[in-house]
Design a protein with these regions (language model features):
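Secretory/periplasmic and organellar redox-cofactor proteins
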Residues: 1-46, 61, 104-137
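Acidic/histidine-rich, surface-exposed loop or edge segments in extracytoplasmic proteins
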Residues: 16-22, 76-87, 98-101
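Immediate flanking context of iron-sulfur cluster ligation sites
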Residues: 35-51, 78, 83-88
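Local cysteine-cluster metal-coordination motifs and their immediate loop/turn environment
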Residues: 47-61, 75, 90-98
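Residue-level marker of positions within ordered structural domains that often coincide
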Residues: 58, 79, 121
Length: 137
């Protein structure tokens, strides 16, 4: 009986701590959780925004599939309400989840999707990428 009560309390705490039913890897850091929450609740705002980590041109980053929807594909494969599933890529890629959070902030400031797209493209236009990190030229 006691184990049943403790188990029930645990389930309530887990459900309360994760009301959006995010995958466990999305809960690793508060910023990652915020980015995955944004992708789930307002994914249309990430659709067509550029992903600048290079994963859009390398299908191996996403289980063999190339991006078709931009930054949104770093978080979600397909439509979650219609058989889609989460993608773990953004939980492991600071560029992806940080750009999603930057986009969220810019939307909150009243920027349009086109303005945000330009800001993200400009942000990386003067940088070069290596296998390990981003360097300023």
């Amino acid at each position: 009986m006691l184990a049943s009560i403790i188990g029930g309390i645990f389930l309530i705490k887990v459900a309360y701590a994760n009301p959006l039913n995010l995958p466990s890897y999305a809960l690793l850091k508060p910023q990652i959780k915020e980015a995955y929450s944004f992708a789930k609740l307002e994914g249309d705002k990430l659709q067509d925004l550029p992903c600048n980590c290079g994963c859009m041109s390398d299908a191996s980053s996403h289980g063999g599939r190339l991006h078709s929807r931009g930054l949104l594909d770093c978080f979600i494969e397909g439509d979650l309400s219609n058989g889609g599933k989460w993608d773990s890529h953004a939980s492991e890629c600071g560029l992806c989840y940080e750009d999603a959070l930057e986009a969220k902030k810019l939307y909150e400031q009243g920027k349009t999707k086109e303005e945000i797209k330009e800001i993200l493209l400009e942000k990386y236009s003067k940088l070069k990428f290596s296998e390990d990190t981003v360097y300023e030229e």
